[in-house]
Amino acid sequence: MRNIQIALTKGRLEKHVIPLFEQIGIDCSELKNKGRKLVFQSKNTNVSFILVKAVDVATYVEHGVADIGIVGKDILMENEKDIYEMLDLGVGICKFCVASIPTYNPKSYRKKRIATKYPHITSTYFHDKGEDVEIIKIEGSVEIAPLLGLADAIVDIVETGKTLQENGLIVFEEMHSISARMIVNKAALKTKKDEIFSIVNMMEQEILSGK
């Protein structure tokens, strides 16, 4: 069987996804004891893994370096890539929200300034609502923007809401629910069809059995 390379994102999503691969019989012991390594071979299958930044997973898949990728829906929404989205894995679930300080008025007619790491998603959301906003792109912690007067509100991913609460912010609007997705390179789906669909189908059955 041909080797299948899977790109995973480092961090929180990685911890959610490794058990799913183990449950379908793919050894992930090297991933659990990785040290500083970034490339790993499963000991019992033709699967190898690479660990990259979340924003780069879809790029590796699009260019064929990885056959399969696991990435948050937020990355796919913000960065349009020429890939196939195969499965909603139902893990890493959170929401895009509009949040701000308690005095924020979402119904105000004046042009608002919105700070976010996700300018495309944010501009599309407000455009669809018919609202003209100024988008301020921030790479770091966006929660501070309303506190310092840089922005009227923020758009960010919210899981528990604890970070917002600790910074005195509240959620005003829930925009989109997001979760981890399995994506596939278009060319690989033709050249490695059997191997890829074997993983996709087993993963789908595992997800359905867990519901």
Swiss-Prot record:
Chief place where the protein resides: cytoplasm
Lineage of the organism: Bacteria, Bacillati, Bacillota, Bacilli, Bacillales
Subcellular location: Cytoplasm
Keyword entries, A-Z: Amino-acid biosynthesis, ATP-binding, Cytoplasm, Glycosyltransferase, Histidine biosynthesis, Nucleotide-binding, Transferase
GO cellular-component term (any): cytoplasm
Gene it is expressed from: hisG
Function: Catalyzes the condensation of ATP and 5-phosphoribose 1-diphosphate to form N'-(5'-phosphoribosyl)-ATP (PR-ATP). Has a crucial role in the pathway because the rate of histidine biosynthesis seems to be controlled primarily by regulation of HisG enzymatic activity.
Subunit composition and interactions: Heteromultimer composed of HisG and HisZ subunits.
Pathway: Amino-acid biosynthesis; L-histidine biosynthesis; L-histidine from 5-phospho-alpha-D-ribose 1-diphosphate: step 1/9
Record field: catalytic activity: 1-(5-phospho-beta-D-ribosyl)-ATP + diphosphate = 5-phospho-alpha-D-ribose 1-diphosphate + ATP
Family, similarity comment: Belongs to the ATP phosphoribosyltransferase family. Short subfamily.
Domain statement: Lacks the C-terminal regulatory region which is replaced by HisZ.
Protein name (record): ATP phosphoribosyltransferase
InterPro entries recorded: ATP_PRibTrfase_cat (IPR013820), ATP_PRibTrfase_CS (IPR018198), ATP_PRibTrfase_HisG (IPR001348), ATP_PRibTrfase_HisG_short (IPR024893)
SUPFAM superfamilies in the cross-refs: Periplasmic binding protein-like II
EC number(s) given by UniProt: 2.4.2.17
Coiled coil: none
Biological-process GO terms, alphabetical: L-histidine biosynthetic process
Superkingdom per UniProt: Bacteria
Originating species: Bacillus cereus (strain G9842)
Alphabetical list of Pfam families matching this protein: HisG
Broadest EC class assigned to this enzyme: transferase
Single GO molecular function: ATP binding
